[in-house]
Amino acid sequence: MNITFLGTSSGVPTLTRNVSSLALKLSQTAEVWLFDCGEGTQHQLMKSNIKSSQIKKIFITHMHGDHIYGLPGLLATLGLSGNSNGIEIYGPSELKSFVTSALESSFCKLSFPLRFRAVEDFASLNKILFENDKLKVHCACLKHRLPAYGYRVSEKDKPGVFDIKKAEDSNIPPGPIYSELQAGKTVQLKDGRSFNGQDFCGPPRKGESFVYCTDTVFSKSAVNLSKNADLLVHESTFSKEDEKMAYEKLHSTTIMAAKTALLSNVKKLIITHLSPRYTQRSSIKPSDLLKEAQKIFPNTYLAKDFLTAEIK
């Protein structure tokens, strides 16, 4: 799996950063899952290597405009191209009325169904938000000025590496039967011999995990959600020098994001959602924000629009 940042600015877009949105490209299928959809997201998609037609799920963290204003427009555009299977949208309960009102008021009729799922109960009760045979999604309550939710996408463990040579040495003819053995199934050949696939596979390979936390001040629930994840994307709206403002607005500093990564034992941290006050011409530059976080958590990277990063 990999992610592509479509917007990395906090509050308002800048000349170099759009407002919040991130695309997760699944390795198991051709699907793309979108996290937040600020104004201008569909334009960012056009500039990226992400195909909007592959978007099947959209996860919204909270109802602030810089995270949702691009959603009705994106859905309207997708409606022109057609998407017969529909799109699932996860987020706060108010999200459904916002989207349907915008579409109805503009006389927009989609050519595909929208399926909304409110996340409040799943977050408060620590229930699985979504699960299939390869992935599961959890969410958790964050700490912001209005209800906000972080998301974790966890890939289930994959079968171990299949030992082709061992299968060949056992005179098992190559073909579809190898796939069954790799899946751990017991198969019987035409000559009557039976083989257990687990005997031909190495130990299971641990699945990848990705966590997206914004907007929030430092939160223990974000730490718990991020435990042992391969990649944490966490907001870092403010420098440590502006900590007072972070507490007033319930946003994170670079130190808070790095502390979350450290306490949750993640492998890699990418900081995003930067305040537009930090530019190449300001006294505190984006590169300074990165250095602040790296002092606490060395394996930290700075997000920028269109950056693509592997989960593991």
From Swiss-Prot:
Superkingdom, taxonomy of origin: Bacteria
Cofactor stoichiometry and binding remark: Binds 2 Zn(2+) ions.
Cofactor: Zn(2+)
Assigned keywords, A-Z: Endonuclease, Hydrolase, Metal-binding, Nuclease, tRNA processing, Zinc
A Pfam family per the record: Lactamase_B
Active site residues per record: 66
Subunit structure, as described in the record: Homodimer.
Function: Zinc phosphodiesterase, which displays some tRNA 3'-processing endonuclease activity. Probably involved in tRNA maturation, by removing a 3'-trailer from precursor tRNA.
Name this protein carries in UniProt: Ribonuclease Z
Encoding gene per record: rnz
